[in-house]
Amino acid sequence: MSEIQSLTAQALADVAAAHTPDQLETLRVALLGKNGSITAQLKQLGTLPADQRKAAGEAINLARDALTTALSERKQVLETAALDARLEGERIDVTLPGRRGERGGLHPVTRTLERIVEIFARLGYELSDGPEIEDDWHNFEALNFPPHHPARAMHDTFYFGDGRLLRTHTSGVQVRYMDTAVATKSGPPLRMIAAGKVYRSDSDQTHSPMFHQVEGLLVDEHSNFADLKGTLSEFVRAFFERDFEMRFRPSYFPFVEPGAEVDIAWQQPDGSTRWLEVLGCGMVHPNVLRSVGIDPERYTGFAFGLGVERFAMLRYGVNDLRAFFENDVRFLRQFA
């Protein structure tokens, strides 16, 4: 009996002194395993006198239960300590300065395009879209371009082998818009703008083979040139957020009659003022209205077009159009 008590006391001390789960498992096997010391005591019960077996068995069972409980409790203590140590090692110091994310920004051409569209939306114009690969009818014929017009020449237009082309202006969207309005009997009256990429075989400091254009169209029973002037004057004032002296110069565009180019009195860095062309416009040619099934005797309309990059250059003081397409981060970061 004293032997089991001594063995139990020593075993409990060893369990309490274990510092790792591996040490604890080694003790468990040595004490309670198949060949463990407590197990050996149970096997020796049969060799004891009959009057001692009951008391010895009770003592061994009590020792086994005490050791099992001690092993379980010590295991829990070691696991908790290990978890605390891991949490401490992985703790995030919230007082450290964070990593700042780089703030992006819209491209200046995109900013300008969205600004133009938003202004015309306030004036009641609906944004419409169309294909960049266009057919001859929508890009030229329906817009009153005679077959001999210079804009049809190969040096102005990018053609595909099947006769299709990269649109040279967004006016083709106006034709599609009017076609749909007539077919669905949703207009006229109608007003819309088309915005997107256009393509022309031209490249220098102020021209790019690909650029962005916004064109607008209004068709109604009583629209006139005064309405056109008022619309464009309001747009220019809203875009630049200041008033400009404007002039409308007679000009020729096949799809309008009369046609005009719009100049604004632009102040130079040296304080002088010069006229700067910013828009083309005019009253929709009757042939264009007829091509989409609108009666020009009843309806009139006006149209206008502008280059987005041109307005971006003026708004941001950029002198070279090509800077918008070179993807120089040093340049683009100024607009972020």
Curated annotation (Swiss-Prot):
InterPro entries noted in UniProt: aa-tRNA-synth_II, aa-tRNA-synth_II/BPL/LPL, Phe-tRNA-synth_IIc_asu, Phe-tRNA_ligase_II_N, Phe_tRNA_ligase_alpha1_bac, Phenylalanyl-tRNA_Synthase, tRNA-bd_arm
Co-factor(s): Mg(2+)
An example Gene Ontology molecular-function term: magnesium ion binding
Family annotation (SUPFAM superfamilies): Class II aaRS and biotin synthetases, tRNA-binding arm
GO cellular component annotations of the record: cytoplasm
Reactions listed under catalytic activity: tRNA(Phe) + L-phenylalanine + ATP = L-phenylalanyl-tRNA(Phe) + AMP + diphosphate + H(+)
Top EC category: ligase
Name of the protein this chain belongs to: Phenylalanine--tRNA ligase alpha subunit
GO biological process: phenylalanyl-tRNA aminoacylation
Cofactor remark from the record: Binds 2 magnesium ions per tetramer.
Naturally occurring in which organism (per UniProt): Xanthomonas campestris pv. campestris (strain ATCC 33913 / DSM 3586 / NCPPB 528 / LMG 568 / P 25)
Keyword terms, alphabetized: Aminoacyl-tRNA synthetase, ATP-binding, Cytoplasm, Ligase, Magnesium, Metal-binding, Nucleotide-binding, Protein biosynthesis
EC number assigned by the record: 6.1.1.20
Coiled coil: none
Subunit structure: Tetramer of two alpha and two beta subunits.
Residue sites binding Mg(2+) per the record: E257
Main location: cytoplasm
Domain of life (superkingdom): Bacteria
Cell compartments where the protein resides: Cytoplasm
Similarity comment: Belongs to the class-II aminoacyl-tRNA synthetase family. Phe-tRNA synthetase alpha subunit type 1 subfamily.
